[in-house]
């Protein structure tokens, strides 16, 4: 029930990764990357399926060898989401996966050899209508740039990015996006700010090698939150030393918190104190797990007492305000006659949320059908 995001997004060109639009006002996409051995087709496909279940838009797969390229062919055949092939050094791998239907190539043109080889890859991408991501990383800058700046700086990452952009510009290829990732939040943020002023191509956001699930999520939320709040960014990946499924969840949570793109339940819950009339923490934890399958955007407030509960419920799709034995229930900001038994709160609230989601989905389908009929 909250208003749309006030963020004005940076204007950028449009590319397509498979059928997924990126840039030019398209919804900001959430990506992840497999961490299985690509040659283990079954394990890689299983991980992609798990990512699909939590709503991933695009998945990147490392393709370091020709054997991995052959495996990629089989993986692609069994995947429903667009796949990006991550390739370094050997340009022939890029040519091979292009034959196998890759949706995007993640390369740095400067590290795959001579201009003739670069031209071969770009011509192949052009022929198959495959976009390219230029992926600059603070940990792998070119030797001459490292010597020039002494250490990774925003200016160093920008120079590296523009060097690769210029290569594609000279080859008259404009179907690309760019990233300038670093593990340091300030370095990454300031690098993206500089790059956003130089080009109008879509930008892929990320804090690279951010850390474990907790610390990496915090770094990513701060870094990407700063950029997204300034309108910078067209697609993102949360880089965690954790299950890739967690990357997708955190990515959507960041977009949801800025009201940029909502997917599933936005829980509003108090940290609890001695005034709570039911087990708020247990209720929230249980419902987050039970309702992971819902994709309908909804605000659900779960507040343990009447101090802030009614106010939060007024701006929530579903709201609960704690009271002794039986807690107050709100729907669309209106208090209902029905009350929840505090001992059966979880089951009752889950049922109400699912029923509301079904109703909202049905209403949306009616609106879509009416628009299509026009």
From Swiss-Prot:
Any GO molecular function: iron ion binding
Catalytic activity of the protein: (2E)-4-hydroxy-3-methylbut-2-enyl diphosphate + oxidized [flavodoxin] + H2O + 2 H(+) = 2-C-methyl-D-erythritol 2,4-cyclic diphosphate + reduced [flavodoxin]
EC primary class: oxidoreductase
Annotated positions binding [4Fe-4S] cluster: 270, 273, 305, 312
Cofactor binding note of this UniProt entry: Binds 1 [4Fe-4S] cluster.
Keywords: 4Fe-4S, Iron, Iron-sulfur, Isoprene biosynthesis, Metal-binding, Oxidoreductase
Domain of life of the source: Bacteria
InterPro entries to which the protein is assigned, alphabetical: Dihydropteroate_synth-like_sf, IspG_bac, IspG_bac-typ, NO2/SO3_Rdtase_4Fe4S_sf
Cofactor(s) listed in the protein's UniProt record: [4Fe-4S] cluster
Ligase keyword on record: no
Gene Ontology biological-process entries: isopentenyl diphosphate biosynthetic process, methylerythritol 4-phosphate pathway; terpenoid biosynthetic process
EC number(s) per entry: 1.17.7.3
Pathway: Isoprenoid biosynthesis; isopentenyl diphosphate biosynthesis via DXP pathway; isopentenyl diphosphate from 1-deoxy-D-xylulose 5-phosphate: step 5/6
Reported function: Converts 2C-methyl-D-erythritol 2,4-cyclodiphosphate (ME-2,4cPP) into 1-hydroxy-2-methyl-2-(E)-butenyl 4-diphosphate.
Protein family per UniProt: Belongs to the IspG family.
Protein name according to UniProt: 4-hydroxy-3-methylbut-2-en-1-yl diphosphate synthase (flavodoxin)
Record organism: Yersinia enterocolitica serotype O:8 / biotype 1B (strain NCTC 13174 / 8081)
């Amino acid at each position: 029930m909250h208003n749309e995001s006030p963020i004005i997004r940076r204007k950028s060109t449009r590319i397509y990764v498979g059928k997924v639009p990126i840039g030019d006002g398209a919804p900001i996409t959430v990506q992840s990357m497999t961490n299985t051995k690509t040659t283990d087709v079954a394990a890689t496909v299983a991980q992609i399926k798990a990512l699909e279940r939590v709503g991933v838009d695009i998945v990147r797969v490392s393709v370091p060898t020709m054997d991995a390229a052959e495996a990629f062919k089989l993986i692609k055949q069994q995947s429903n989401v667009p796949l990006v092939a991550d390739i370094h050094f050997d340009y022939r791998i890029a040519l091979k996966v292009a034959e196998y239907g890759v949706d995007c190539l993640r390369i740095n043109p400067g590290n795959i050899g001579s201009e003739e080889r670069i031209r071969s890859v770009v011509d192949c991408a052009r022929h198959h209508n495959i976009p390219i991501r230029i992926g600059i990383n603070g940990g792998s800058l070119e030797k001459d740039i490292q010597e020039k700046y002494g250490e990774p700086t925003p200016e160093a990452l920008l120079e590296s990015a523009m060097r690769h952009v210029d290569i594609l510009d000279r080859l008259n290829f404009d179907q690309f996006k760019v990233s300038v990732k670093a593990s340091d939040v300030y370095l990454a943020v300031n690098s993206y700010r500089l790059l956003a002023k130089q080009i109008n191509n879509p930008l892929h956001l990320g804090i690279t090698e951010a850390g474990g699930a907790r610390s990496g999520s915090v770094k990513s939320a701060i870094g990407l939150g700063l950029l997204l709040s300034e309108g910078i960014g067209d697609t993102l990946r949360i880089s965690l030393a954790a299950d890739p499924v967690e990357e997708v969840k955190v990515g959507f949570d960041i977009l949801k918190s800025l009201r940029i793109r909502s997917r599933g339940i936005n829980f509003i819950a108090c940290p609890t104190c001695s005034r709570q009339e039911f087990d708020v923490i247990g209720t929230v934890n249980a419902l987050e797990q039970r309702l992971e399958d819902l994709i309908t955007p909804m605000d659900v407030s779960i507040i343990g007492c009447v101090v802030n509960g009614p106010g939060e419920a007024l701006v929530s799709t579903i709201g609960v305000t704690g009271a002794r034995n039986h807690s107050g229930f709100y729907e669309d900001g209106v208090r209902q006659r029905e009350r929840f038994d505090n001992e059966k709160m979880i089951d009752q609230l889950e049922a109400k949320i699912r029923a509301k989601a079904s109703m909202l989905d049905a209403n949306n389908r009616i609106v879509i059908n009416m628009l299509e009929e026009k």
